């Protein structure tokens, strides 16, 4: 197992960027390495050029190309201290702190300075949230219905007009990007030549302009015949979709159709057209006038025999609103119907002023979602070639994408009758798939009155995560003939915004119980944020529990939250330890592999050296045998005391007796050149340490006297040969 030479490993820290920003923020507060001074309304702000240039296109154009010395930048009067101070804090901490007092100023400064990574929809959402509905309702009196401009056509006539609808006109209307809005047409219609800024760019616009825009939407059918034909087509489609769902409603209100017709006739048509006109430009600024355009707020209750629907009801007695839109519109609000049984209509007490204010404030959070869903429903109903298979696939994908959000949204579920369960489930899935256009998360900060907005890579829907704070839960049961209002369940203030860490980690004991724990959190109302429970130390946590009087359910919930967070941290540490062990094992394996490679190289080197030594020894023996003319007796003695591995073992051959000494030695040495060295003969072990020169001299002496010496001298000669063999054996043993 060897690693590739081209393998590259990268370590990525998840806290490096955050720590760098925090360090830069500390330097800014201590005026360390700051190289630019910003003057806003006479107040002085110190900062770093690189940070400002990276966060704002305005500062980038002002800073790039300047000298390296101290730089002073005075911002124009459009930028205020109240709006600039949160922005410079955002540049260094990635947290934008907004309140009701500074949201307008911050919005203007963001637009003027071109600050990056801030969603504009965040400000639009807060504008409606911080809007004081009581003051605005007093400034903008209720308008009466324009029955002359909004004459409702008969249902059968609308069905016939749909067949005559010209497709090219509808496509031209949808593709025309420069079409005039109802707001502009109204001002020309009323003779008002003064132009006002768009709703999405104006932070101080009141409900007065919204009421004017409502009048424009009501008067629009008389101005544009093409659009009137277009909205009739949408109206008939909606009737076909919701006809089976609201059949009983239509039957119960049919005797009073004419008394309600004048006020309720044109509202759905105008509503549809307004949504289609303003959807792409201003999703967040469109729906407030829709809430004002309600039947309960426009028609006098004393003139009709039927009690009008409440403030936030979107049911039209004639069925022009599909039931799916009803579910989308009223899922997060209080939906109270008058009891209807056997076509007997019971009058209901009108809503008081405080109820209207609370419902209007609660609905203002859902308006962007409703507008987007209304547009989606119109487009999906109008396209007749969309098959049911595609809808099922879209529903499946939407459920899979928003499964985490839906698991925390348990108190906001709808309980529908079998007649409308299918439509309701389809619209709920559409609702879940409509949120990704708004990529912000709103988390509760420990300080009261402050919220932190963060742009996320994994999109979280702010409306679903915060509507429970304003009372989002309601249970609606719709029967075939009767409508019974359910009491509103008190939601948990922190139920939908609890974030206990990364849910994508490996399952632990706490994660396996996450579903039941979250349900418990939604049922138990906690007096403080769950994030505070996790972040406190043990002593601070105990003191916090002593400060509050908590019920056993609340204590169980708090301890469960803290236990699950500790389990998650312990699991992370365990995974880190395992990763460290794996890395240590990998390093040890690499060391062993390198040692093995070095040992193999050393072995190859030793084998090559041994081969060279054997070759040298064989050549040496051959040379000695050539120089020493051995007699027949000497050869026999040498062969007798030599081992089989000795280079001189050729003397054992029987051919040696008949062949001369010189002719025998040469070929035998060549043939046995690769054999290992010989072992010491027994008679030569006494002379074990003579040198090479001494052995050679003894051989020469024995060679010179071999012919003249007698049998007594042969022992001496054999001792010289033994010395020679001993020398050769010692050398071979040393080399090995």
From Swiss-Prot:
Modification after translation (UniProt): Ubiquitinated by the SCF(FBXL17) complex or by the by the SCF(FBXO22) complex, leading to its degradation by the proteasome. Under oxidative stress, reactive oxygen species covalently modify cysteine residues on the bZIP domain of BACH1 and release it from chromatin. If the BTB domain of BACH1 remains intact, its beta1-alpha6 degron is recognized by FBXO22, promoting its ubiquitination and degradation.
Biased composition (Polar residues): 696-708
Region spans: Leucine-zipper: 582-589
Keyword Chaperone set for record: no
Ranges where the bZIP domain occurs: 557-620
Segments of skewed composition (Basic and acidic residues): 286-295
Segments of this protein annotated with the region Disordered: 286-312, 349-389, 680-719
Gene: BACH1
Keywords from the UniProt entry: Activator, DNA-binding, Nucleus, Phosphoprotein, Repressor, Transcription, Transcription regulation, Ubl conjugation
Gene Ontology biological process terms, A to Z: DNA repair; negative regulation of transcription by RNA polymerase II; regulation of DNA-templated transcription; regulation of metabolic process; regulation of transcription by RNA polymerase II
Stretches the record annotates as Basic motif: 562-578
Domain BTB: 34-100
Location(s), subcellular: Nucleus
Pfam families: BTB (PF00651), bZIP_Maf (PF03131)
Chief site of localization: nucleus
Name recorded for this polypeptide: Transcription regulator protein BACH1
Gene Ontology annotations for the cellular component aspect, listed alphabetically: chromatin; cytoplasm; cytosol; nucleoplasm; nucleus; RNA polymerase II transcription regulator complex
């Amino acid at each position: 197992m060897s690693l590739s030479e081209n393998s590259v490993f990268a370590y990525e820290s998840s806290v490096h960027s955050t720590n760098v920003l925090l360090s830069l923020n500390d330097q800014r507060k201590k005026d360390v390495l700051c190289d630019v001074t910003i003057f806003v309304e006479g107040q002085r702000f110190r900062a770093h050029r690189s940070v400002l240039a990276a966060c704002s296109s305005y500062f980038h154009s002002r800073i790039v190309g300047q000298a390296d010395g101290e730089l002073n930048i005075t911002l124009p009067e459009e930028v205020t201290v109240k709006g600039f101070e949160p922005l410079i804090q955002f540049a260094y901490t990635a947290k934008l702190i907004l309140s009701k007092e500074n949201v307008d100023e911050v919005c203007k400064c963001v637009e003027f300075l071109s600050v990056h990574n801030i969603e504009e929809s965040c400000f639009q959402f807060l504008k409606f949230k911080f809007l004081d509905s009581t003051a605005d309702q007093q400034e903008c009196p209720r308008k009466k219905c324009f029955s002359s401009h909004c004459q409702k056509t008969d249902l059968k006539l609308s069905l016939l007009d749909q067949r005559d609808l010209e497709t090219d006109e509808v496509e031209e209307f949808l593709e025309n990007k420069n079409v005039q809005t109802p707001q502009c047409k109204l001002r020309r219609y009323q003779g008002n030549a003064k132009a006002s800024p768009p709703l999405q760019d104006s932070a101080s616009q009141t409900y007065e302009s919204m009421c004017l825009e409502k009048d424009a939407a009501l008067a629009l059918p008389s101005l544009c015949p093409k659009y009137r034909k277009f909205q009739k087509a949408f109206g008939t489609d909606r009737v076909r979709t919701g006809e089976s769902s609201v059949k009983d409603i239509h039957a119960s209100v049919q005797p009073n159709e004419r008394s309600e017709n004048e006020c309720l006739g044109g509202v759905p048509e105008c509503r549809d057209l307004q949504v289609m006109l303003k959807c792409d430009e201003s999703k967040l600024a469109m729906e407030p006038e829709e809430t004002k355009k309600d039947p309960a707020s426009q028609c006098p209750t004393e003139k009709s025999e039927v009690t009008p629907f409440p403030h936030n009801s979107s049911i039209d007695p004639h069925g022009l609103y599909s039931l799916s839109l009803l579910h989308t519109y009223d899922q997060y609000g209080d939906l109270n119907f008058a009891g209807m049984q056997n076509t007997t209509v019971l009058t209901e007490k009108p809503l008081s002023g405080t109820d209207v204010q609370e419902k209007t404030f609660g609905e203002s959070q859902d308006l962007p979602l409703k507008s987007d869903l209304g547009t989606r429903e119109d487009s999906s109903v109008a396209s007749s070639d969309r098959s049911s298979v595609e809808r099922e696939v879209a529903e499946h994908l939407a459920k899979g994408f928003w499964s985490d959000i839906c698991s925390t949204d348990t108190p906001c579920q709808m309980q529908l009758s079998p007649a409308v369960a299918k439509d309701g489930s389809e619209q709920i899935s559409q609702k879940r798939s409509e949120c990704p256009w708004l990529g912000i998360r709103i988390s509760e900060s420990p300080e009261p009155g402050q919220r932190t907005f963060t742009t996320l890579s994994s999109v979280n829907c702010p409306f679903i995560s915060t509507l429970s704070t304003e009372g989002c839960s309601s249970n609606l049961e719709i029967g075939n003939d009767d409508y019974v209002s359910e009491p509103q369940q008190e939601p948990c203030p922190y139920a939908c915004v609890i974030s206990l860490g990364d849910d994508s980690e490996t399952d632990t004991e706490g994660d396996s119980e996450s579903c039941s724990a979250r349900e418990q959190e939604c049922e138990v109302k906690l007096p403080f944020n769950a994030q505070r429970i996790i972040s406190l130390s043990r002593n601070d946590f105990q003191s916090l529990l002593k400060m509050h009087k908590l019920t056993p359910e609340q204590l169980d919930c708090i301890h469960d939250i803290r236990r699950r967070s500790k389990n998650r941290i312990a699991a992370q540490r365990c995974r880190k330890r395992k990763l460290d062990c794996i890395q240590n094992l990998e390093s040890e394996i690499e060391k062993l592999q390198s040692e093995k490679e070095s040992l193999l190289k050393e072995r190859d080197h030793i084998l090559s050296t041994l081969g060279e030594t054997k070759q040298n020894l064989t050549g040496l023996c051959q040379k000695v045998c050539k120089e020493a003319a051995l007699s027949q007796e000497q050869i026999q003695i040498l062969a007798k005391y030599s081992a089989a591995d000795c280079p001189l073992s050729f003397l054992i051959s029987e051919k040696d007796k008949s062949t001369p000494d010189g002719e025998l030695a040469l070929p035998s040495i060549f043939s046995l050149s690769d054999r290992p060295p010989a072992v010491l003969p027994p008679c030569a072990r006494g002379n074990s340490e003579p040198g090479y020169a001494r052995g050679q001299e003894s051989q020469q002496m024995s060679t010179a006297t071999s012919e003249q010496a007698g049998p007594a001298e042969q022992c001496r000669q054999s001792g010289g040969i033994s010395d020679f063999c001993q020398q050769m054996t010692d050398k071979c043993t040393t080399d090995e």
